[in-house]
């Protein structure tokens, strides 16, 4: 059976770090009102140098944020693989539409996915399967279309200007609740599963408009799900 994103527990975090934008401090309220008026993220809160957004007071599945040094979006267990990209881009475009906001040059574009897919195996059984079937370096090259730079418990790859760091392994539910960011979804965490932590990043990409962000986000989001699917198919 192929990996069904609706049956996994996951969290996806986009963070775009840029050079300091001091004027953000003066326009926090303007950004809050403008983005809230668009309708996707109407609930906001302001701290010293940051504005956080949510779809509602009760909804903890999504968070958008903008500060004097970064802008980003978080989605927990999206309904589809495309959901993260579409929601994040709508939020970013809502912020960019504020006339007084201008994002400085980007110093780091990062996208991190933590994915836990369930298994019917015991922990010992899944560990045995993992030791027998874990992808070899050549297979990882094909999965990511990238060259391995380091290999061990953590694998580091590079595709063009994009770096990829991957770690994964069998995990019991209690460990997932306390040692990963998935603990916020503790009611959905299985007793045993295979955990993957996939980090894509690019340093100093310079100026980025919404089209460049959308293209790169689409690439790394697809790459993360492709990796999760490959591991799922190999192990289960």
Regions found by a protein language model. Give the residues of each.
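Well-ordered, non-membrane alpha-helical segments in soluble/globular domains
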Residues: 31, 84-94, 213-227
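Glycine-rich, often proline-containing surface loops adjacent to acidic residues and nearby aromatics
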Residues: 7-15, 62-78, 103-114, 190-203
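Aromatic/basic-lined ligand-recognition segments
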Residues: 109-197
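N-terminal low-complexity, intrinsically disordered segments
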Residues: 1-76
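Internal, hydrophobic cores of structured domains that mediate oligomerization or house catalytic pockets
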Residues: 66-142
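Short glycine-rich, low-complexity/disordered patches
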Residues: 41-52, 97-118, 138-159, 223-236
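Short, conserved charged micro-motifs
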Residues: 21-27, 82-84, 123-124, 204-215
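Long, compositionally biased interface segments
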Residues: 186-236
């Amino acid at each position: 059976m192929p990996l069904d994103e609706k049956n996994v527990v996951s969290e996806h975090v986009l963070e775009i770090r840029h050079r300091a934008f001091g004027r953000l401090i003066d326009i926090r309220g303007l950004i809050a009102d403008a983005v809230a008026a668009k309708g996707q993220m109407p609930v906001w809160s302001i701290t010293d140098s940051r504005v956080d957004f949510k779809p509602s007071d009760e909804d903890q599945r999504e968070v958008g944020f903008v500060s004097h040094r970064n802008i980003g979006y978080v989605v927990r267990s999206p309904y589809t693989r495309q959901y993260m990209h579409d929601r994040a881009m709508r939020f970013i475009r809502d912020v960019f539409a504020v006339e007084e906001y201008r994002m400085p040059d980007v110093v780091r574009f990062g996208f991190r996915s933590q994915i836990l897919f369930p298994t019917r195996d015991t922990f010992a059984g899944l560990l045995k399967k993992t030791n027998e079937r874990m992808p070899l370096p050549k297979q990882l090259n094909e999965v990511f279309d990238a060259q391995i730079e380091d290999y061990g418990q953590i694998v580091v790859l590079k595709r063009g200007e994009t770096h990829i760091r991957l770690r994964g392994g069998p995990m019991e539910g209690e460990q997932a609740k306390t040692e990963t960011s998935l603990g916020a979804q503790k009611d959905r965490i299985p007793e045993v599963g295979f955990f993957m932590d996939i980090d894509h990043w690019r340093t100093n990409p310079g100026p980025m408009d919404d089209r460049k962000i959308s293209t790169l986000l689409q690439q790394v989001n697809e790459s993360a799900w492709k990796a999760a699917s490959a591991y799922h198919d190999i192990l289960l």
